[in-house]
UniProtKB/Swiss-Prot annotation:
Keywords (A to Z) from UniProt: Flavoprotein, FMN, NADP, Oxidoreductase
Species assigned in the record: Escherichia coli (strain K12)
Source species taxonomy: Bacteria, Pseudomonadati, Pseudomonadota, Gammaproteobacteria, Enterobacterales
Name recorded for this polypeptide: N-ethylmaleimide reductase
Catalytic-site annotation from UniProt: 187 (proton donor)
NCBIfam families registered for this protein in UniProt: PRK10605.1
The gene coding this protein: nemA
Function: Involved in the degradation of toxic compounds. Can use a variety of substrates, including the nitrate ester explosives glycerol trinitrate (GTN) and pentaerythritol tetranitrate (PETN), chromate and various electrophiles such as quinones. Involved in resistance to hypochlorous acid (HOCl), which is the active component of household bleach and a powerful antimicrobial during the innate immune response. Catalyzes the reduction of N-ethylmaleimide (NEM) to N-ethylsuccinimide. Together with NfsA and NfsB, can use the nitroaromatic explosive 2,4,6-trinitrotoluene (TNT).
InterPro entries for this protein: Aldolase_TIM, OxRdtase_FMN_N, Oye-like
Superkingdom of source: Bacteria
Chemical reaction(s) catalysed: N-ethylmaleimide + NADPH + H(+) = N-ethylsuccinimide + NADP(+)
Description of what induces expression: Repressed by NemR. Induced by N-ethylmaleimide and reactive electrophilic species (RES) such as quinones, glyoxals and methylglyoxal. Up-regulated by HOCl.
GO biological process: 2,4,6-trinitrotoluene catabolic process; nitroglycerin metabolic process; xenobiotic metabolic process
Length: 365
């Protein structure tokens, strides 16, 4: 297949992306604290990358409780919304499109980041056994062990759904084109999906129908708030991410969730594949089962090359590819790939925290 398909437009819910090379959500931890407020530097960073068919923002808190990393932005205060408005305006001025990725980090958090220094919340009081990021006195990211969470009470769960709903309303106000619900990588929605992190015995635990209940309630709240054509979702239903696996029936459970999402006609399904984290790549047989259940746009992300993306788009198994670190180092990634130009080297030491260095200073062609 010619690579022209990668550079052809794609209807994604309410928008039409100019190409199929999307910018994956990338946590960079450069927001202002206190307040978790996006900065003018972040506006410049995203504006530089507006040639992506769709920019998916870094993961963004739906509430103060949802915070898990020092320096990650929120979208639950007037100051945050006002700052995001400037960011989306800059992307739109360059004819780009932008979704905001909404998350609640759940147990991947630290008590020092939580309101009142409380324990983070989770489906069950089970440690994530992983690390998160705080800031040192110089504002640099430092890695620390996550705190032991407490289990959400049943009566608290509608409040989580409502926090997502309000964040979706705020995203609309802030000028985003779409939202992406973060239901992957071991964060709260994924914690409910996973039988290893969800030991509940009420209607949110046990069967796959119960474990998927929260994420589907959040999706339905988003559809009610803004319409199915504005709601995307990211899932990582195969493999293990941050010590959160998908249980012994991961494929069947994945297909149940994807079928339910497909029935709702949402804007897109973003599949975070396990091979970027050392897992096995998806088989075409599994991809075909996903496609049979979800007829809207499917975005692939993971250990992708241009060749892999072209092949899978050609087979009709995905519709777009989301690159991550390549976008960090190459603000003009689409032009570079189209011209087969050399890519800038990545500077991993500046991925998280800091200022303009390693953020807005990568050269273009």
């Amino acid at each position: 297949m010619s690579s022209e398909k990668l550079y052809s437009p794609l209807k994604v819910g309410a928008i039409t992306a100019a190409n199929r090379i999307f910018m994956a959500p990338l946590t960079r931890l450069r927001s202002i604290e206190p307040g978790d407020i996006p900065t003018p530097l972040m506006a410049e960073y995203y504006r530089q990358r507006a040639s992506a068919g769709l920019i998916i923002s870094e993961a963004t808190q739906i509430s103060a409780q949802a915070k898990g990393y020092a320096g990650a932005p929120g979208i639950h205060s007037p100051e945050q919304i006002a700052a995001w408005k400037k960011i989306t305006a800059g992307v739109h001025a360059e004819n780009g499109h932008m979704a905001v990725q909404l998350w609640h980090t759940g147990r991947i958090s630290h008590a020092s980041l939580q309101p009142g220094g409380q324990a983070p919340v989770a489906p069950s009081a089970l440690s994530a056994g992983t690390r998160t990021s705080l800031r040192d006195e110089n504002g640099q990211a430092i890695r620390v062990e996550t705190s032991m969470p407490r289990a959400l009470e049943l009566e608290e769960i509608p409040g989580i759904v409502n926090d997502f709903r309000q964040a979706i309303a705020n995203a609309r106000e802030a000028g985003f084109d779409l939202v992406e619900l973060h239901s992957a990588h071991g964060y709260l929605l994924h914690q409910f999906l996973s039988p290893s992190s969800n030991h509940r015995t009420d209607q949110y635990g046990g069967s796959v129908e119960n474990r998927a209940r929260l994420v589907l309630e959040v999706v339905d709240a988003g559809i009610e708030e803004w319409g199915a054509d504005r709601i995307g979702i990211r899932v990582s239903p195969i493999g293990t991410f941050q010590n959160t696996d998908n249980g012994p029936n991961e494929e069947a459970d994945a297909l149940y969730l994807i079928e339910q999402l497909g029935k709702r006609g949402i804007a897109y399904l973003h599949m975070s594949e396990p091979d970027w984290a050392g897992g096995e790549p998806y088989t075409d047989a599994f991809r075909e089962k996903v496609r049979a259940r979800f007829h809207g746009p499917i975005i692939g992300a993971g250990a992708y090359t241009v060749e892999k993306a072209e092949t899978l788009i050609g087979k009709g198994l995905i519709d777009a590819v989301a690159f991550g670190r390549d976008w960090i180092a190459n603000p003009d990634l689409v032009a570079r790939l189209q011209r087969k130009a050399e890519l800038n080297p990545q500077r991993a030491e500046s991925f998280y925290g800091g200022g303009a260095e390693g953020y807005t200073d990568y050269p273009t062609l």
